[in-house]
UniProtKB/Swiss-Prot annotation:
Gene Ontology terms: cellular component: cytosol; plasma membrane
Top-level taxon of origin: Bacteria
Subcellular location: Cytoplasm; Cell inner membrane
Keyword Oxidoreductase: no
Region annotation G5: where it falls in the sequence: 148-150
Organism: Borrelia duttonii (strain Ly)
The protein's name in its UniProt record: GTPase Era
Single biological process term from Gene Ontology: ribosomal small subunit assembly
Domain Era-type G: 2-169
Region G3, annotated ranges: 57-60
Annotated region (G1), positions in chain: 10-17
CDD domains: Era
Binding of GTP, residues: 10-17, 57-61, 119-122
Role of this protein: An essential GTPase that binds both GDP and GTP, with rapid nucleotide exchange. Plays a role in 16S rRNA processing and 30S ribosomal subunit biogenesis and possibly also in cell cycle regulation and energy metabolism.
The gene coding this protein: era
């Protein structure tokens, strides 16, 4: 039996979280076209007769000196050193640039085994030629490269085979029925944040976070009171929407997803609260991301 920890890294919006969800067969990490939707290191667990793979989804790799981004990058670096194998995800639509150079430099310096995954091969307009040239120039062997579509489930089984080939014999670190080790309150919080980002598209991705104020398991259903926190007064109105339609829509969709994942009905009460300039508070950012 084989087992091991595998980090998933790459630039923002390359499909890392979609890949994690696709492999594990569950919605573990929230997905969005909005860059850097993932903030924490999210573990997804895949177990079959061959063994167990513990995936660590990471924030999108982005070079920036802002406090928020530095905290995100610290999560990426710590995930790399915790793993036996790195999956480096490249979006087939992206022209290789400075961040690709930096990511490969970090991987190669780490001396940790890695696989390069070129994602979204179902898309017609691509930079595949440029990507392959870039990887060739970096002396990446072809047997380390696999092309997939996480969304369309293309070559996912082949990718699992490739991962197992690169893992050592080891125990099951988690019971075989586990597909994540996330605590319930974090999962619920992330679901609400994911739905909010989806509804607002690109208006507020970095300016919100969610917190669970009350979480009680009451016989046949969960009772949840949660807050969506914004950094500026004007953002409250964007989330609440005209006549409260925005927050109502967020609540309804979040409730459906939470009930499905937890396999139990839930009463969800949402509020929008202002914590002015929270996204500039280094201590709070550290607590949120770690």
């Amino acid at each position: 039996m084989k087992s091991g920890f595998v980090s998933i890294i790459g630039r923002p919006s390359t499909g890392k979280s979609t890949l994690l969800n696709s492999i594990c067969g569950h919605q573990i990490s929230i997905t969005s076209s909005t860059p850097q939707t993932t903030r924490n290191k999210i573990k997804g667990i895949f177990t079959d007769k061959r063994g167990q793979i513990i995936f660590i989804d990471t924030p999108g790799f982005h070079l920036s000196k802002k406090n928020f981004n530095i905290a995100l990058m610290n999560n990426v670096y710590s995930a790399i050193i915790e793993t036996e194998l790195i999956i480096y995800v490249i979006d087939i639509q992206d022209q290789p640039g400075t961040e690709e150079n930096e990511i490969l430099t970090i991987i190669q310096r780490s001396k940790i085994n890695f696989i390069v995954v070129i994602n979204k091969i179902d898309i017609h307009k691509t930079k595949e030629k440029e990507i392959m040239t870039f990887l060739e120039e970096k002396k990446i062997q072809k047997n380390k490269i696999i092309k997939i579509s996480a969304e369309k489930q293309i070559n996912i089984e082949t990718m699992k085979d490739k991962i197992y080939e690169n893992l050592n014999e080891g125990p099951l670190y988690y019971p075989k029925e586990y597909y994540t080790d996330q605590k319930i309150n974090l999962r619920i919080s992330e679901i609400i944040r994911g739905v909010t980002i989806k509804k607002l598209k690109e208006e507020l991705p970095y300016s919100i976070y969610t917190e669970i104020e009350i979480l009680e398991d009451r016989e046949n259903k969960f009772f949840i009171k949660a807050n969506i926190i914004v950094a500026g007064e004007s953002q409250k109105g964007i989330i609440v929407g005209k006549g409260g339609k925005g927050i109502k829509s967020i609540g309804e969709e979040s409730r459906k997803i939470i009930s499905k994942i937890l396999e139990k009905k839930c009463n969800l009460f949402l509020q929008v609260k202002l914590r002015k300039n929270w996204n500039k508070n280094a201590k709070l950012i550290k607590n949120l991301i770690n």
